[in-house]
UniProtKB/Swiss-Prot annotation:
Keywords per UniProt: ATP-binding, Cytoplasm, Kinase, Lipid biosynthesis, Lipid metabolism, Nucleotide-binding, Phospholipid biosynthesis, Phospholipid metabolism, Transferase
Protein name according to UniProt: Probable ethanolamine kinase A
Gene coding for it: etnkA
Main localization of the protein described in the UniProt heading: cytoplasm
Top-level lineage group: Eukaryota
EC number: 2.7.1.82
Role, per record: Highly specific for ethanolamine phosphorylation. May be a rate-controlling step in phosphatidylethanolamine biosynthesis.
One GO MF term attached to the UniProt entry: ATP binding
Pathway the protein acts in: Phospholipid metabolism; phosphatidylethanolamine biosynthesis; phosphatidylethanolamine from ethanolamine: step 1/3
Organism listed in the record: Dictyostelium discoideum
Amino acid sequence: MMAKTKGSYEVFHYTVTKDKVNKGLCDIARYFVPEYRNSKDEDLTIQKLNGGITNVLYLVEDKNIEQKYRYLPVVIRLYGYKSEEIIDRKNELIIQTEADQNGLGAKFYGLFDNGCIYGFIKGEPLAYEDISKPTMQTCIAKEIAQWHSIEMPTRKNPSLWPTIKKWAALAPDVYPVPEKNEYYQSINVKKMIEEGKMLEQRLAQLNSPIVFCHNDLLSGNIIYDPSQNCASFIDFEYANYNFRGLELGNHFNEYAGFGPDYSLYPNKESQIHFLTDYHRSLFKTEPTQDELEKLYIESNQFSLASHLYWGFWAIVQAMNSQIDFDYLEYGKARFDRYYETRDQFLNLN
């Protein structure tokens, strides 16, 4: 249980084990949070949070402590099994600490051997049914614009295609669970890899700007604070520099939820409302019709890349994750949606 300070965060050499999760979470909270230093196990309440399909999240709170501190209670994230194969933890750490120092996101307390701990952002995580509401769209669009306007001390090369290729290379020829191999073969991974090559060339023609992106704006990663009428983003695991169109198109895909129900994909009117608020917040000017049309085409064409990104992600997760979620079915749903919309979106002009 040795600890050391590194930059503006601490590293605690401690592993939360499966057989003693609650005890481990209490130890982590006591170590990192000064206000909880003297809290006993029975003082700390632990609530498992919904929404994560890469890691497991817990809210830890001492209800005896006056809630005047900005980032109490705290969230403890336990990394998913072999999640380091899909997450660049070093890059995530740089982004997490920089975001904390720039007031973007929650206070970051530090790392332990199989997870991290950060402050709780006041508000409610949105449900996928919420993010299509016009008032929520405005809040989310403004926050995305803020993200896209900041500078981070990481490489400014877009991470989309290298990440897709990395994950695709991890996809097996034969699925390791024999009874699921026939279903896996129906996905036709090799064909999806070829689609990725074609799409990379097509989307390059859009010259989508490279900006700092969250890259995972599903509803559960968006916290709405009604007292301030604003949205904040959490969970920066996939954050990196990327194409603007990917951030926007990926978010529109998330209207469908984990189901996913793509009948909920936003129509053009809904997208234009969102993109208008985004443009106003980012550029401080009213967008022209041509600018909105360009954003609309860019977003929808990059939504195709989002399906490839999360489709290959799901295949890797299906082989490794111990979270109760049907990743293989989800991955196939993303690839199926890619084919359903490919020609329609690539023909937009």
